[in-house]
A protein has these predicted regions:
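Conserved acetyl-CoA-binding loop-helix of GNAT-fold acetyltransferases
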Residues: 92-105, 127-132
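Conserved active-site tyrosine of GNAT-family acetyltransferases
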Residues: 59, 130, 135, 157
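A short beta-loop-alpha structural element at the N-terminal edge
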Residues: 1-15
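Acetyl-CoA-dependent GNAT
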Residues: 30-89, 100-101, 160-161
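Helix-loop element at the rim of GNAT/NAT acetyltransferase active sites that forms part
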Residues: 15-32, 45
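Conserved catalytic-core motifs of GNAT/GCN5-like acyltransferases
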Residues: 66-69, 74, 116-119, 136-153
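Hydrophobic adenine-recognition pocket in adenosine-nucleotide-binding enzymes
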Residues: 5, 86, 119
Length: 162
């Protein structure tokens, strides 16, 4: 089941990201998410008309997705960037696609024209997943990320919403 996240989901969402993201190069983030930080993110996105979604299985958060404006400034008001993460047991179940589709529908309803993904160059599964969800690879930036003592490429992928 996919639903919009609430502050009550903050601790579980933070734990999911800490388990899935921190030990990998899926994201370049080095710091653990706290429940308070996630709570603030969920609230901030809701106030700005953006959204955070969770995927539930047996009442447990097994997936997370959110989106926000791609870059600051009014010239980017119709370009959104998302993040998505799934626990290993939720991969291949359709929940990831459902999260992406929920983000895309919400963003389009708010006037977004494009949805962007910044995928680690090492994350072949993530790039393939996004391609299956209608994203196309636009550019590969060499080395803007850094984690585990090495530079990491960033692949920009885009999905048209209109």
């Amino acid at each position: 089941m996919i639903r919009e996240a609430s502050p009550a989901d903050a601790a579980e969402a933070a734990a999911l990201l800490n388990e899935v993201v921190l030990p990998t190069t899926i994201s370049f983030r080095h710091e653990e998410w706290s429940a308070a930080e996630m709570d603030a993110r969920i609230r901030r996105l809701a106030v700005t008309g953006r959204a955070t979604f969770v995927a539930l299985r047996d009442g447990r958060v097994v997936g997370f997705a959110s989106y926000d404006q791609f870059r600051g400034g009014s010239g980017y008001a119709t370009a959104m960037e998302h993040s998505v993460a799934l626990r290993p047991e939720a991969r291949g179940t359709g929940l990831g696609r459902a999260l992406i589709d929920a983000v895309a529908a919400h963003a389009a309803k708010g006037g977004a024209r494009t949805l962007w993904a910044g995928v680690s160059g090492e994350n072949e599964a993530g790039r393939a997943f996004h391609a299956r969800c209608g994203f196309e690879e636009i550019a590969r930036l060499p080395g803007p990320g850094f984690k585990f003592g090495r530079p990491l490429d960033l692949v920009l992928m885009r999905r048209a919403l209109v």
